[in-house]
Amino acid sequence: MTVGAVPRGHYRFRHAARMEWIKLRTLRSVKWALLVALAGMIGIGIAAGHNTINARGDVTNNILAGGALGSLVFAVLGVLVMTSEYSSGTIRATLAAIPRRPLVLAVKTAVFGVVALVTGEAATFAGFLAGAAFVRTGIPHPALSQPTVLRAVGLSGAFLCLVGLIGLALGAIVRHGAAALAAVVVLVFVAPLAGLAQTPAGKFLPLLIYANSLGATQPVSGFTLSPWAGLGIIACYAAVLLAAAGWLLSSRDALTG
């Protein structure tokens, strides 16, 4: 794929999106990371499905446990999509070609968001189908024909996309790969393990929302957020961080501000 000649500084959204797509698909780390997410979610889904022994438990929720690994991979990808340009210095060329800095972030968000949503849903559905096939005899076999199961699987894929966008936003805010990755790991993974899970704020932590709401087909005791409300909260996190990233990208120097 080639990008048609566009005068320097006059990229429109369509041209900028094509350029971003080329950059994204030529990042070797993207392909490997997506393969890791797919393989990991399938493997965990199979193990969780086969090892489920409680016939009254939420089998679907168990099978979707691989979403924790998947969300880490997608968070890393989001960080890399943004910080790779800062580490290589190509962000200056990008901003020279697209002086409207909000457009730069909008394009990255749109292109990566579409890729993350499609691949996140694919990995989640693959993990679920593989895990469901290995559920033992005597344990209820979940099926996509069940509305609550289809909702849980679909929202789990959307969760991966949103965590990836959170990673992208933090990458734009921090501009350093290791620091941005540390920030997203703390927000998504460390906070639930740091005692916050038992506090009133616990139900607003991304990973707990995923485990107890988005990926659940049965109400979880003590967790009052509905699946759609949980997804809305995660989307708000991503939106607020992306807004902050857009403001910072527009107000400071490309590399040193």
Segments (PLM) and residue ranges:
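Terminal transmembrane helical anchor/hairpin motif
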Residues: 2-11, 33-37, 42-61, 144, ...
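Membrane-interfacial helix-loop-helix connectors in multipass membrane proteins
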Residues: 129-153
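Transmembrane helix boundary and interhelical loop/hinge segments in multi-pass membrane proteins
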Residues: 56-59, 78-97, 101-102, 109
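Aromatic- and glycine-rich beta-strand/loop motifs that create alpha-glucan
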Residues: 1-34, 175
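Long, hydrophobic alpha-helical segments
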Residues: 64-85
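Hydrophobic alpha-helical transmembrane segments of polytopic membrane proteins
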Residues: 73-79, 149-174, 232-245
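Selective transmembrane-helix segments that form parts of the transport pathway or gating/packing helices
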Residues: 102-130
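Residue-level signature of transmembrane alpha-helical entry/exit and packing/kink sites
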Residues: 15, 29, 33, 65-68, ...
